[in-house]
């Protein structure tokens, strides 16, 4: 197929956001053994997320404390989010050929990766949505590898969202890169339930991960989405060379943004990308990160996203018992995920009910 010419998205003129978590003005608190007790009082009892310094203290806990940490994060999830798990499927409408240089992504046209540009037609979108709904999922996200949508892509989204909503009883979400105000308004008018646009990593680390656009541009799109009344899905990719301090910084920045959902991706190093030789995140470190983000975001949907298979394997059950309350079923955009039956069996074994569509409306 012939790849479309992707028009650069013109971002609205806005003042770059000032995030209070960028600068710590108070004296650093000493790392102590009471962080879990403090988290129990503040997060479990009061529903207030940990700040950046306390998230860092959690990330620095020794392996011996991991069991207690996961148990606390699970209690927080149950108290403030409930026992249900939200299930989502995703589909790539436009794959590959992206003009951006996100160093972890094999869909960038700037890297020598095996992913080639391709488009999916509307009937295929509808069939994928039907298959997703058959798993019990309440969310179906249409994703495109672009800087932002051009006219062709918006026309395809217009047609695809209408066809899915007519044929399938499922919430439709989109992930189409950076948006203009006009595009945000149109997506909201189409009935798009949720929009995904990840911060990816901490503001201080972002220039080492992406150079073709700024962290502030991503933040601006997220703010536009929230203002338009769509639910905001904004998450992270863990393991892209960030320090623990920067991981805590990101958690605090996400808390300041207040998204409805935070998907946690773990780096699955892709051949041909600048981060293709980075190591996968250690499983214990990944579980600590999940729990730390739950303690920073006690009321937020925290979703398993890409990379959990290579990072955690069968230990992904521990993440479900350590703060996670949503999953993506099936394959990801360019990598394989677990088959849906395996994930659904895991939820059944854990006696975790799947959130009904009515509960999301």
From Swiss-Prot:
Cofactor(s) the protein needs: [4Fe-4S] cluster; [2Fe-2S] cluster
The record ties this protein, via PROSITE patterns, to: RADICAL_SAM (PS51918)
Q: Which UniProt keywords apply?
A: 2Fe-2S, 4Fe-4S, Biotin biosynthesis, Iron, Iron-sulfur, Metal-binding, S-adenosyl-L-methionine, Transferase
What does the entry list as the binding residues for [4Fe-4S] cluster?
A: 98, 102, 105
Q: Which reaction does it catalyse?
A: (4R,5S)-dethiobiotin + (sulfur carrier)-SH + 2 reduced [2Fe-2S]-[ferredoxin] + 2 S-adenosyl-L-methionine = (sulfur carrier)-H + biotin + 2 5'-deoxyadenosine + 2 L-methionine + 2 oxidized [2Fe-2S]-[ferredoxin]
One GO term in the molecular function aspect is:
iron ion binding
First-tier enzyme category under EC:
transferase
**What does the record list as GO biological process?**
biotin biosynthetic process
Question: What note does UniProt attach to the cofactor annotation?
Answer: Binds 1 [4Fe-4S] cluster. The cluster is coordinated with 3 cysteines and an exchangeable S-adenosyl-L-methionine. Binds 1 [2Fe-2S] cluster. The cluster is coordinated with 3 cysteines and 1 arginine.
The record ties this protein, via Pfam families, to:
BATS, Radical_SAM
Name the EC number(s). Answer: 2.8.1.6
Regarding protein family, the annotation reads: Belongs to the radical SAM superfamily. Biotin synthase family.
Q: What is this protein called?
A: Biotin synthase
Give the gene that encodes this protein: bioB
